[in-house]
């Protein structure tokens, strides 16, 4: 393990070299870098190997994006996705042919200003998470920021990334805090905890590149999907890459706490009720007759 960490630490200097080279790019050129990486990943036959090779460049891209957001508004030529975002979220504004990404936005009802840039220890944490290691970070060391690195990288495959937190508040908070960073580079992001089980928007959330939610939310959706009698009722489609917050609590402390689906499915059974009502009434009439 120590040997592996030393290898990963050497990647940090490479990431920072690329990061500094990006400082001279315009905002549009920075976005174009992201587009070119996505094309490379999409055209690859071995996406895992391609992601591993692209890691330094992608982490530098995310770090530079975070730096620019920390300095103020980020202005780029508007595309169709920018226009759609501006009509649905407050962190993007369209003026003429320009999209203005603000560094201040509403994070679930709380005003928030982006002021975070990844430091070396956070880069190391992001590398370890991508390669499947469990890492321990104290409160305040920036777990939310660390997660942006492997989440962004693995979202480039468009096969889905699930980010699981321990409660509803954290999943919504992290979704709101980091959404603009991902959206700036064209990635789609949603949070399942904002919608009920049979809301079509919950199904859309699973189709996004990045999906936030609680571990219980993901588990129960998985269980309900396996109880569904119609494939159209299923919401989860892909199980590609996941990051689990509070891993020790979820996989060790609460490992013996079962997730149980009890009772009927939550579908509209009014038609079934009406169909059998006449038969029930007829039966009651027969019973009451002498």
Task: Please annotate each region the language model reported.
Residues 1-284, 288:
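Conserved P-loop NTPase motor core
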């Amino acid at each position: 393990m120590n040997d592996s960490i030393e290898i990963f630490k050497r990647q940090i200097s490479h990431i920072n070299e690329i990061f500094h080279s990006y400082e001279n790019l315009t905002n549009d050129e920075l976005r174009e870098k992201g587009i070119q990486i996505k094309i490379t990943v999409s055209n690859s036959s071995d996406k895992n190997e391609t992601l591993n090779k692209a890691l330094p460049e992608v982490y530098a891209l995310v770090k530079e994006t975070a730096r620019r957001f920390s300095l103020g508004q980020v202005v780029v030529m508007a595309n169709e996705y920018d226009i759609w975002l501006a009509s649905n979220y407050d962190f993007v504004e369209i003026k003429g042919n320009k999209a203005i990404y603000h560094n201040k936005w509403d994070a679930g009802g709380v005003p928030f200003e982006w002021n975070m840039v990844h430091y070396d220890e956070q880069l190391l944490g992001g590398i370890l998470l991508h390669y499947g290691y469990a890492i321990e970070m104290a409160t305040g060391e920036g777990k939310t920021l660390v997660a942006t690195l492997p989440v962004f990288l693995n979202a480039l495959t468009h096969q889905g990334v699930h980010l699981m937190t321990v409660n509803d508040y954290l999943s919504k908070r992290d979704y709101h805090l980091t959404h603009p960073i991902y959206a700036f580079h064209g990635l789609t992001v949603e949070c399942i905890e904002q919608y009920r089980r049979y809301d079509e928007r919950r199904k859309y959330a699973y189709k996004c590149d990045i999906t936030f939610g609680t571990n219980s939310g993901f588990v129960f959706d998985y269980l309900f999907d396996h109880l569904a009698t119609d494939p159209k009722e299923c919401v989860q489609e892909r199980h590609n890459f996941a990051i689990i917050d509070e891993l020790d609590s979820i996989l060790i402390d609460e490992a013996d706490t079962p997730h149980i689906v009890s009772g009927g499915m939550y579908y509209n059974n009014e038609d079934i009720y009406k169909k059998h009502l006449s038969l029930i009434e007829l039966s009651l009439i027969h019973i009451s007759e002498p």
